[in-house]
């Protein structure tokens, strides 16, 4: 028997549905596969970008580290070169200063040397003046002489040692024929005075031991420079208004001092009153 057309339509529809069902999971599978592929691609892209970024960052860090290391090495090299140059410059400057000083330093050194040289003779002169030997004495003091010794005796004794220039023998005021007990003998040469000192110090004259000592001549006194003081300015006379008040005061005081206080006028009145009262009582 031949199937009816309605059954044929149903069968065709069922077949179409089955085919559609079969196609739908395939589409779903294909869509899922496509989504997975896209996700994988995205992941791979992100991983690639991240890896590239990582590589870039690592490369940048490596480049920065390299640059920093390079810069540090460069800075260290520059610092070392600077230190080397500074040390070399210092050594060169020290060697130059030690070896050949600059002209300005030479001038200063020459000036200092010239100043020191110029100052030295002045110091030498001062030292010579200070160290100059004191003049040898020519005058001898003779002490502890007895009053019987005279100038002639001293001249006779001390003339044996050299030429005597002067003999000074002070005399007592109250007894002009007697000495004060000492005398000064001045020789012409200092050697003669030294000889007299050696022989007569502790010697005896007129039975008494005497003393002989050198007399140092004082340094000649230099006259002090006179300082001319400026002339004193005469003060102007005081004005007239200052002169007048003391005169007026003197005039006003003088009559007060001269005029005595009169008290005699009261006494006779009292006496009269008393005399009257006494006369009335007697009456």
Swiss-Prot record:
Biased composition annotated in UniProt, kind: Low complexity: 45-103
Disordered: annotated segments: 1-140, 221-283
Subcellular location: Nucleus; Nucleus speckle; Cytoplasm
Stored PROSITE patterns: RRM (PS50102)
A GO molecular function held by the record: RNA binding
Biased composition (Basic residues): 104-120, 128-140, 244-276
Alphabetical keyword list: Cytoplasm, mRNA processing, mRNA splicing, Nucleus, RNA-binding
Keyword Nucleus: yes
Span of domain RRM: 161-240
GO CC entries: ASAP complex; cytoplasm; nuclear speck; nucleoplasm
Task of the protein: Component of a splicing-dependent multiprotein exon junction complex (EJC) deposited at splice junction on mRNAs. The EJC is a dynamic structure consisting of a few core proteins and several more peripheral nuclear and cytoplasmic associated factors that join the complex only transiently either during EJC assembly or during subsequent mRNA metabolism. Putative component of the spliceosome which enhances the formation of the ATP-dependent A complex of the spliceosome. May participate in mRNA 3'-end cleavage. Also mediates increase of mRNA abundance and translational efficiency.
Quaternary structure annotation from Swiss-Prot or TrEMBL: Component of the active spliceosome.
Protein name: RNA-binding protein with serine-rich domain 1-A
Lineage per the UniProt record: Eukaryota, Metazoa, Chordata, Craniata, Vertebrata
Name of the coding gene: rnps1-a
């Amino acid at each position: 028997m031949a199937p009816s057309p309605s059954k044929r339509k149903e069968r065709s529809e069922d077949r179409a549905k089955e085919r559609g069902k079969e196609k739908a999971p395939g589409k779903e599978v294909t869509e899922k596969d496509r989504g997975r592929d896209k996700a994988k691609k995205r992941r791979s892209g992100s991983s690639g970008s991240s890896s590239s970024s990582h590589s870039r960052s690592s490369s940048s860090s490596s480049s920065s580290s390299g640059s920093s290391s390079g810069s540090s090495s460069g800075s260290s090299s520059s610092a070392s070169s600077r230190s080397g140059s500074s040390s070399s410059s210092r050594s060169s400057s020290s060697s130059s200063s030690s070896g050949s000083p600059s002209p300005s330093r030479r001038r200063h050194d020459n000036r200092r040397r010239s100043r020191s040289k110029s100052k030295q003779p002045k110091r030498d002169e001062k030292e010579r003046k200070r160290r100059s030997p004191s003049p040898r004495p020519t005058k001898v003091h003779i002490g502890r002489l007895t009053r019987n010794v005279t100038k002639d005796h001293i001249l006779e004794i001390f003339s044996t040692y050299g030429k005597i220039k002067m003999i000074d023998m002070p005399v007592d005021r109250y007894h002009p024929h007697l000495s004060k007990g000492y005398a000064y003998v001045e020789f012409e040469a200092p050697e003669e005075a030294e000889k007299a000192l050696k022989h007569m110090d502790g010697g005896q004259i007129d039975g008494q031991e005497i003393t002989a000592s050198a007399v140092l001549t004082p340094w000649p006194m230099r006259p002090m420079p006179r300082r001319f003081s400026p002339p004193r300015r005469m003060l102007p006379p005081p004005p007239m208004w200052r002169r007048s008040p003391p005169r007026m005061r003197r005039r006003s005081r003088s009559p007060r001092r001269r005029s005595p206080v009169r008290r005699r006028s009261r006494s006779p009145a009292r006496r009269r009153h008393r005399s009257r009262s006494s006369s009335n009582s007697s009456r």
